[in-house]
């Protein structure tokens, strides 16, 4: 069975991976995909679909997912509530207006900058576990990020550190 598939940088416009149910790594970065169905790939741990033209992405069946890199697409919605094993989420440079990572208690890296966020829910209790966090360049609509420990977040995540834009509170 195919376990890893790397087809990045190939100008692909479509790809059917539904028969590859044993995949644990799928890298389709830098293609021209407008859609991709990974609902049958329930063993996926590492999924990289950055630099495509994806308008939607359903990862609800990919509960083993640890890394999701879906940056530079056209995503308006990203539901990662079922992805409780997720440690690395990079969804920067999309069109997301809301992001809820409150179910993702194992996150150590969250890159959600260059979106149109008005709501960011990080009430997952892992505030100090994040070694990489960037929610900048979301315009002026994001004014408050939901966290469990606002005092810690205020002291450690600042605009000077490049974590948030000026004026954002917790």
For the regions a language model picked out, list residue spans one by one:
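Leucine-rich repeat
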Residues: 1-2, 19-23, 40-44, 61-65, ...
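Consensus "Asn ladder" position of solenoid repeat domains
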Residues: 10, 31, 52, 73, ...
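Conserved hydrophobic beta-strand positions in leucine-rich repeat
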Residues: 5-7, 24-28, 45-49, 66-70, ...
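Leucine-rich solenoid repeat scaffolds
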Residues: 118-170
């Amino acid at each position: 069975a195919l376990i890893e598939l790397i087809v990045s940088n190939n100008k692909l416009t479509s790809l059917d991976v539904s028969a590859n149910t044993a995949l644990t790594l799928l890298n389709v970065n830098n293609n021209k995909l407008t859609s991709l169905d990974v609902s049958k790939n329930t063993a996926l741990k590492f999924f990289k679909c950055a630099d495509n033209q994806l308008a939607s992405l359903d990862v609800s069946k990919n509960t083993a997912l640890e890394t999701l890199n879906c940056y530079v697409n056209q995503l308006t919605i990203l539901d990662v509530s079922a992805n409780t094993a997720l440690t690395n989420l990079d969804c920067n440079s999309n069109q997301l207006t809301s992001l809820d990572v409150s179910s993702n208690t194992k996150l150590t890296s969250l890159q959600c900058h260059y979106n149109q966020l008005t709501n960011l829910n990080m009430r997952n209790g892992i505030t100090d576990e994040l070694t990489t966090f960037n929610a900048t360049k979301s315009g002026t609509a994001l004014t408050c990020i939901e966290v469990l420990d606002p005092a810690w977040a205020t002291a450690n995540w600042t605009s000077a550190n490049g974590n948030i834009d000026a004026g954002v509170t917790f």
